[in-house]
Amino acid sequence: MFRGSHVAIVTPMLEDGALDLDRFCALIDFHIEQGTDGIVVVGTTGESPTVDFDEHDLLIRTAVSYADGRIPIIAGTGANSTREAIELTVFSKNAGADACLSVAPYYNKPTQEGLYQHFKAIAEAVDIPMILYNVPGRTVADISNETTLRLAQIPGIVGIKDATGNIARGCDLVQRVPDNFAVYSGDDATALALLLLGGHGIISVTANVAPRLMHEMCTAALSGDLAQARAINARLFKLHIDLFVEANPIPVKWAVAKMGLINENIRLPLTALSSQHHELIRKAMLQAGITV
């Protein structure tokens, strides 16, 4: 079971939109040095909707090869086609990823039974630990707690990233899942609350900008040091909110670029952060102790 702070890592790109693998590898080193507990590659924050199959495979293989066992690599493999999701999951398995993160199918609006059959088919087709990803604000499809509990009985499905931000719902889930099934927060602003209610970790956007603080907050919360966890979260809270002033990953790419780690380049239909929001993000970074 993975525990702690897992960064939903950005995908660096060159001016022409090509992948910047040199900076990608440098980011992996940065997160290892900063204490990040795991890396999610090609998730929402990694611009998965605009990364093609070959690039997807390349990013996962590069991450696994370069990390070389120094940090767990979790591969984003979701798609709104079950067949494509299986293919992406096969990529991850063959590349040697430690687990996959599979988002609920978006746009085609499956029923709860459709969601169950989708994830069941992937788990039965590919032998790799699978973390479900529920983010109805993006997908429209919402994996209910009851469906999650059904899926938790399937071998290979080991956890869920709950990005609903609904604490009551997360608390209900934590209390009812099997002991070998992990619940991860996918919403930085409410992550501490879920951790204190029994969650196992975070898959975080903020960790791109403040990886050591996110690791320390998770460690404090999971060890019962409430005062320390609350103090760190207070420093980070403005980042948690303001990194979503525009669609993720627009603001976080700007922030990581200002740290000198990547170029701000982003693929259409996403565009660079509006200048009116630059100072907002800068102030949030300064509040967290990040000099820009």
Curated annotation (Swiss-Prot):
SUPFAM superfamilies assigned to the protein according to its UniProt record, in alphabetical order: Aldolase (SSF51569)
Pfam families referenced in this protein's UniProt entry, alphabetically: DHDPS (PF00701)
Listed GO CC annotations: cytosol
Disulfide feature: none
Alphabetic keyword roster: Amino-acid biosynthesis, Cytoplasm, Diaminopimelate biosynthesis, Lyase, Lysine biosynthesis, Schiff base
Binding site for pyruvate: 45, 203
SMART domains (alphabetical): DHDPS
Entries under InterPro entries matching the protein: Aldolase_TIM (IPR013785), DapA (IPR005263), DapA-like (IPR002220), Schiff_base-form_aldolases_AS (IPR020625), Schiff_base-form_aldolases_CS (IPR020624)
Active site per database record: 133, 161
Keyword Cytoplasm: yes
Positions marked as site (Part of a proton relay during catalysis): 44, 107
PANTHER family documented for this protein: 4-HYDROXY-2-OXOGLUTARATE ALDOLASE, MITOCHONDRIAL, DIHYDRODIPICOLINATE SYNTHASE
Designated name of the protein: 4-hydroxy-tetrahydrodipicolinate synthase
Gene behind this protein: dapA
